[in-house]
Swiss-Prot record:
Lineage: superkingdom: Eukaryota
Renumbered residue ranges of the record's region Disordered: 389-410
Compartments where found: Membrane
Protein's UniProt name: LIMR family protein SELMODRAFT_432208
Coiled-coil spans in chain: 245-274
Source organism of this protein record: Selaginella moellendorffii (Spikemoss)
Length: 410
């Protein structure tokens, strides 16, 4: 898709013939189609396929995943249809102004800033009317400066019909992601830097002997056998049809203990025999550095939210102005800084998911580790991190077959 997009954009350059622009592929529509297919069909199918019981055959897992995808698609279509039928359109009134005419004059002193058009008897000028259309949890402002328009005022009724477009569908997809982004991102902005700093603080500070290593490994083996026994007991309960609240609670507890056991095994291997390796020491130093940098980024994001988003009107543009100034300094400095701040938000979402819980609705949250990350975790991060709001209104058409409502502005 990316090479095709670049090739189609370059086909409209000045050194090519004009007809090339008309023969290009509709890349914008193709990107929309790929995005919708991935978020509605491909990613949910992959999540349900890998989340299904591993003891089932591939055919059974495919059927189970397809069944869940069909259910999800049905709910999605019903939600889309109901919302479009209820809030798929919006009507509002506006004032139309037109100017009178007069013979050509040589003295333009009567036309000034206070009277920028020809005023007829019985009409008065007004300015700065703001029309607002509310749709799908978003507000779209339309600013009309009427100081340069003219004087004949009449009330007319305009009906704005919002056509069903792919951007409406994309907006529906991103609502869930936006909610998860706010929830996990807020938690992750605190847990991400602090977890890195505490990992450095709790690092292995000395190399243990072989006798100590054998003793610790024996204790870990006992814990492993206890977890295995508990897991076999849960499997017997599952086969017996016991899947109540207590069963799910015990499963979650076993999963958490398994994660803790894996962390302890990794820490033991770092203390012996890898404790003296240079990479191990540098790895923890890198965690400390990134933790401090992440803490600074979290504080900056918090300040930006306070001074630019919570205060109405915004007290100061802050990060917006910083990125603009850095971009004027030279090169891609502003763009690179902006990318770092955005990427940090994505990492905060992932960290928030890891610390907030082991299960989200019907999906399990698996830890992300080097050479130990399960496929469903990647798919869940794609959905939870892709929280970019989309405009629900792509195009509009006008009609006048609905009754007018009273003019809402003085």
């Amino acid at each position: 898709m990316l090479p095709a997009d670049v090739a189609n954009r370059h086909s409209c350059e000045k050194n090519l013939y004009v007809g090339a622009c008309k023969l290009t592929l509709p890349m914008k529509q193709l990107w929309w189609a790929v995005y919708i297919i991935d978020t509605v069909l491909v990613i949910p199918f992959a999540i349900f396929f890998y989340e299904s019981d591993q003891e089932k055959t591939v055919t059974q897992r495919v059927k189970n995943a397809l069944l869940w995808v069909v259910i999800l698609l049905t709910v999605f279509c019903l939600l889309l249809g109901i919302l479009y039928a209820v809030i798929g359109y919006a009507d509002f009134t506006m004032r139309s102004l037109s100017s009178t005419t007069m013979a050509f004059i040589n003295d333009f002193s009567s036309l000034n800033a206070k009277a920028s058009c020809l005023v007829s008897a019985g009409f008065s000028l007004f300015s700065n009317v703001t029309l607002m259309v509310s749709l799908f949890f978003y507000i779209f402002p339309f600013f009309i400066d009427l100081t340069t328009l003219c004087d004949s005022v009449q009330l007319i009724c305009l009906d704005l019909w919002l056509k069903l477009s792919v951007t409406y569908v994309i907006t529906l997809n991103t609502i869930i992601g936006s909610i998860l982004f706010m929830m996990f991102g807020g938690v992750g902005m605190a847990t991400l830097p602090l977890s890195l700093i505490f990992a450095f603080k709790n690092r292995p500070k000395c190399v243990i002997t072989r006798a100590q290593y054998v003793k610790e490994a024996t204790d870990l083996a006992k814990r492993s056998n206890e977890l295995k026994t508990a897991t076999l007991g849960l499997q017997r309960e599952e086969r017996g049809g016991k899947k109540g609240r207590m069963f799910r609670k015990n499963v979650k507890k076993v999963q958490q203990e398994l994660v803790f056991l894996e962390d302890d095994v990794e820490a033991l291997n770092e203390a012996f025999p890898q404790g003296e390796k240079t990479l191990t020491v540098l790895f923890y130093l890198a965690k400390l550095v990134f933790g401090i940098v992440g803490l600074a980024l979290s504080i900056i994001w918090l300040l930006h939210i306070i001074v630019f988003m919570l205060v109405n009107p915004p007290a100061f543009p802050f990060l917006n102005q910083v990125f603009i100034q850095l971009d004027t300094v030279g090169g891609l400095l502003g763009t690179t800084t902006f990318a770092i701040f955005c990427y940090y938000l994505v990492m905060s979402v992932i960290s928030g998911k890891m610390h907030l819980g082991m299960r989200l609705l019907f999906l399990s949250i698996h830890p992300m580790k080097y050479q130990g990350t399960l496929d469903p975790m990647w798919h869940e991060n794609v959905i939870a991190s892709g929280a970019q709001p989309s405009s629900a209104m792509d195009s509009s058409s006008w009609s006048a077959d609905r009754p007018c409502r009273p003019w809402p502005w003085p």
